[in-house]
């Protein structure tokens, strides 16, 4: 009887620990949110389509729809915001995007968008460069010096 009780107690502890781990892991995941594609207020670009943005961020184009040079900025390879952006833009997971860029760079075809260390650094650089395009996970305030040209809806 004591062995059965001890076994039941052990199972409860293991299940409790597993449940706690699952809950904490879910809490650590980034919330599903829209991604706001931004350019500086000084930019001539007023809006973009998802296809136009896809071409910029996948290296197929280096110009905005109006023909002006575009300089896309990105977050670091493992940033949760980067994963949310590419998932919303392409429907692909970050590992697939990283693999795509590794192949293109190895073959010498093109270079990926320039990574910046943080979203705040991206905001500052985009504000100062009329050719820049970037993305943020929260809609920027009107006084931030940025214009939202596309909102990518979260796919999950």
Annotate the PLM regions.
Residues 2-3, 34:
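A broadly tuned "polar low-complexity/structure-edge" signature
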